[in-house]
Amino acid sequence: DGAAMSFGRNSAFFDCYFERDLQSGKITETDAQEIIDNIVMKLRIVRFLRTKDYDAIFSGDPYWATWSDAGFGDDGRTMVTKTSFRLLNTLTLEHLGPGPEPNITIFWDPKLPEAYKRFCARISIDTSAIQYESDKEIRSHWGDDAAIACCVSPMRVGKQMQFFAARVNSAKALLYAINGGRDEMTGMQVIDKGVIDPIKPEADGTLDYE
C-alpha cells in the first residue's frame, strides 16, 4: 500500500545545479529557495489510492516520503550543503503547518557544522518535523551512499530493496509457528507442510506463555 517510501538524498543533487545557475546568474537565492519550497509543498499534496483497511489505520493519509540529509562521506567531508539549509528553512513558512511529508531525517554527527546543528535544533523546537539517526551507525553498515528506505530503516541507495513489515500480526505469526503453518480459525494450510514443524506437547513440552 505504499506505507512509506524513500525520497533519497536530494540536497546535494539539487545543490550542484543551484550553484551552477547561481554562478551564471540564471537564478537568484530567492529562486532556489522557492524551488525547494515548491517541492516540499508538492510532497505534501500527494495522495495514494489505498484500501479501506489501510485508511482505517492512519488519519490524514500520510505516506512518509523520507528525505535523508546531512552526515559525512567516507572521505570525511560533510554532506551538508546550502540546500540542506534551504530544506529546513522551508519548514519556517507560516502557512505550511505540521505534516509528515517530507519525513526529514538528519544523519546526525556531533562533528556536523555548528551553524547547521544550531539551525536543526531551532527548527526541531519550532516544528517537531525532523527526526535524527546516527550517521556513524548508518555508514558503518551501509556506507555513505545510504538513505532511509522507509520511516527509519536505512539501505544502500539503488542497490537494496526493503520489504515493509512494521505491521505484522505477531500473534498470528506465533500461531502459525505453533500449528505448523495451519490457520487456527479456518483450518487452511497457509504455509507448505514441512517448512515449519508444529510444536508437539509430548516432545516439545507445554508452551509457557509467561
Named regions from a protein language model:
Residues 1-210:
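Conserved catalytic cores of very large enzyme subunits
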